[in-house]
């Protein structure tokens, strides 16, 4: 009996069992015991990223009307999300490029195919969003597969197209890894319909040199909005809900995984044996809490510090109108909330007291900026990258960042990890295209890459460094004969090695054209 048959028999036995209930994915056989890490770290990071973490933002309130038991929601500045969004903007923007080339020709068919795949999957925007969430939750994942349109009978209706999906850390669990490189994993795809939560558990694993993707389905009745969203529920037949989704897919002789786990730069100090990453604000949780407390206090300053005028209670009583109409009036505007009626001592019985206080806006803003400066240092930014003022609120720095800055070093460290994952993604796309026989303009991808290909990922660092200054520095180094033209073109101008070689050859050819050559061409006459 093959491993495949064993797996299918196991699925059949599951179908016969009526009591296959799983509280969460960590109760599945073969899943590492990461429940504590997700509950203590990833889920709180997600709550902070979304702007409501109950232990922080649901605070008790003591009032005369409700001396105990009342709560209110703490106002949040959401500095954690702002920090991750800024980090993602530094690392990834619309001028970043991914290329795959087989020749020096600018119209390389493989690169044209790759750009078409990226465009159809909205990669430029979607990857930026994923990068932001990855910085917040300590990890994320890309996944590639081929989508083949089916007719009503389940037959192929058109050629397949490569799809890329983008997954947060809460939708992904590694199951096998080597030196922090994840080799096998589970993806969780959850959908609510017909009164149930349906969760597809998608296993990516190896069977020798064969790459396998197997799908299981679980469902849980929807009981309310407050129930945990990570409950799997009862095992349920896949084909009853998703008849066109294959329970088992094999790719023989595969050379790469068809997903890439991406994580921020930095060690996992919470779990030494885990391949999972840490949020960029994992060591700044207390600071983020402090910024929210101060921001809430600033807002409450305007509520609690509003103008109040204390008047004698008897002055607020209604008396007959002096015009003799019999209507009742008050001496003060009863609809104006500035007045507070109190029963005063005899000495103050007729006094009207202005009880207004000065608003403490500047001390609050100074305190918030102090916390933001600490936050910047904790996540790898220069002080002032995040700041707060009374005009625009929380804002980010826009000036060019020097190469010697802390922010520059942090961004480059994150880019190195992302570059490796993006290169692996391109290899996965090419391998899927070969396996499914995909073509580009009449040529198979297998034929196009037969002689090999190169992958280049270019990050646009102009947002974090002065490009003109870098070019000037490179020219000086070349003039001093301590930097080659080829290295300058690759490192500073962003050329691929092939483009740099072609450009150097073109420059050499042009330099052979002398003034004498031009005179000969222009003024020579035939005899």
Locations of the language-model features?
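Extended, helix-rich architectural segments
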Residues: 1-195
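A glycine-biased, small/acidic residue-tolerant capping/turn segment at secondary-structure junctions
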Residues: 424-454, 501-503
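Extended, charged amphipathic alpha-helical segments
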Residues: 241-403, 439-443, 458
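Long, highly charged low-complexity segments enriched in Glu/Asp and Lys/Arg with interspersed Ser/Thr
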Residues: 491-524
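Extended, non-catalytic structural segments that build the interaction scaffolds
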Residues: 39, 43, 58-75, 343-378, ...
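Hydrophobic alpha-helix feature that most strongly marks membrane-spanning transmembrane helices
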Residues: 376-380, 427-438, 479, 493-497, ...
